[in-house]
């Protein structure tokens, strides 16, 4: 059984600030259960390493679910459903957030969003 992990992009304008904050996600694909996938989220308008950054997801027909967070100091936390399978990380030189997803399951099918 195959399933689709989608990617989208989010654009937000900070209220009262003459600065565009943009998060552009990529890396979705059609994956077999048990497979791996890495999502990327390239940020502009702010510094990823100076903020806490999260991944959330929305399974088909359901609400948003929190997946993982990385704090400015580097501490990481995960939802129980993905712990041990997913890894959040960032590349400060590229101002990019990542989500490495291993041992994927059918229930991981969702649209994934990065969020500041």
Swiss-Prot record:
Residues 55-68 are annotated as: Framework-2. The keyword Isomerase does not apply. PROSITE patterns: IG_LIKE. The keyword Disulfide bond applies. GO terms for biological process: adaptive immune response. Disulfide bonds join 41-114. GO terms for cellular component: extracellular region; immunoglobulin complex. Residues 1-19 form the signal peptide. Residues 20-49 are annotated as: Framework-1. InterPro entries: Ig-like_dom, Ig-like_dom_sf, Ig-like_fold, Ig_V-set, IgHV. It comes from the Eukaryota. Residues 50-54 are annotated as: Complementarity-determining-1. Residues 69-84 are annotated as: Complementarity-determining-2. PANTHER family: IMMUNOGLOBULIN HEAVY CHAIN. This is Ig heavy chain V region 5A.
């Amino acid at each position: 059984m195959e399933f689709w992990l989608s990617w989208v992009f989010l654009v937000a304008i900070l209220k009262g600030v003459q600065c565009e904050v943009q998060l552009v996600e990529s890396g979705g694909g059609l994956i077999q259960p048990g497979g791996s996938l890495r999502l990327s989220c390239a940020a502009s308008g702010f510094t990823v390493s100076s903020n806490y950054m999260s991944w959330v997801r929305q399974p088909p027909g359901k609400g948003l679910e929190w997946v993982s967070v990385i704090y400015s100091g580097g501490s990481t936390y995960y939802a129980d459903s993905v712990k041990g399978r997913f890894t959040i990380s960032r590349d400060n030189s590229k101002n990019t957030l990542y989500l490495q997803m291993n041992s994927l399951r059918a229930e991981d099918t969702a649209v994934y969003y990065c969020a500041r």
